[in-house]
């Protein structure tokens, strides 16, 4: 059974073509919307309480428990896109995950953004987004064409400037973050033209999965004869023959094919330690 954890404020239907591909290759798949998003939204988000930590510790955890109930005996695998990879480490039952594939997974520390876009992204996601959220009571992302409307608690987490997840507003309620209980074979896929998913960003998150065997595969568009992939396009059906088999192979076997495109990056990030001035 494969659970797909979506990116921040992305409807689960975005991943339906990828889910169908996995199903056509013999894997059962579960999709879900985080609270306040898509089919899990009911009415206005003004005053609606939801955070990144809720999405992982409550929503993703609930799907994992449901998979265990409804498909007893089946191994549980997870695909996490962007924040969805972080959500996999926030589940109390994360030790049940067999194989984990993340795509562009990080928690948006601004210094990790690609240098060419860093200041623009800092202004957009850490300036304009929280400002509009304070005015509206939620982030009206759909009206702007940026993403789905987003609960204010999620915006507070995303726009925080900390280098460590445990210092984000919603994470302070954890006695200890559950990341270290995940023992899954973990493949982190990053794309060289993804301004969110730089090597530093991917490894900042990977450092939390301290009990997992971790492989970081870095792919350039030219590795698959493309000009661009970016943060979202991995899940577009045009990559069914080039990128999707990488995830499928890992979900089934927990290993990379011999002829996989890209290069593996030597994992160097330590388990996160306190930064000066943070506590």
What is the predicted function of each stretch?
Residues 12-45:
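Conserved alpha/beta-hydrolase
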Residues 70-82:
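Alpha/beta-hydrolase fold nucleophile elbow
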Residues 182, 188-190:
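Short beta-strand/loop motif that positions the catalytic acidic residue
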Residues 184, 197-208:
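Short alpha-helix in the alpha/beta-hydrolase fold that links the catalytic acid
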Residues 219-267:
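Catalytic active-site module of serine/aspartate enzymes centered on a nucleophile-bearing elbow/loop
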Residues 5-10:
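Active-site glycine-rich loops that stabilize anionic/oxyanionic intermediates
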Residues 79-166:
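Alpha/beta-hydrolase-fold enzymes
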Residues 49-70:
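Alpha/beta-hydrolase active-site loop
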């Amino acid at each position: 059974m494969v659970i797909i954890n979506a990116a921040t404020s992305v409807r689960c239907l975005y991943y339906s073509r990828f889910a169908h591909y996995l199903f056509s290759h013999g894997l059962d798949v579960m999709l879900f919307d985080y609270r306040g998003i898509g089919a899990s939204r009911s009415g206005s988000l003004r005053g609606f309480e939801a955070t990144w930590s809720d999405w992982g510790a409550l929503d993703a955890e609930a799907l994992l428990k449901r998979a265990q109930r409804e498909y007893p005996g089946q191994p549980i695998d997870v695909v996490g896109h962007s924040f969805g990879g972080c959500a996999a480490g926030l589940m109390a039952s994360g030790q049940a995950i067999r194989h984990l594939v993340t795509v562009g997974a990080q928690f948006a520390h601004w210094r990790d953004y690609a240098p060419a876009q860093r200041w623009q992204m800092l202004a957009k996601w850490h300036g304009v987004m929280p400002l509009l959220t304070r005015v509206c009571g939620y982030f009206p992302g759909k009206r702007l064409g940026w993403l789905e409307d987003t609960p204010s608690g999620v915006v507070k987490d995303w726009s925080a400037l900390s280098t460590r997840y445990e210092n984000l507003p919603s994470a302070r309620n954890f006695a200890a973050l559950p990341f270290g209980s995940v023992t899954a074979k973990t493949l982190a896929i990053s794309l060289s033209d993804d301004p969110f998913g730089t090597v530093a960003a991917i490894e900042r998150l990977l450092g939390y999965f301290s009990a997992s065997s971790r492989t970081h595969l870095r792919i350039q568009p030219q590795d698959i004869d493309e000009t661009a992939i970016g943060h979202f396009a991995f899940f577009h059906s045009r990559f069914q023959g080039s990128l999707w088999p990488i995830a499928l192979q890992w979900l089934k076997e927990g290993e990379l094919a011999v002829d996989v495109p890209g290069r593996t990056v030597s994992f160097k990030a330590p388990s996160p330690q306190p930064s000066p001035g943070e506590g």
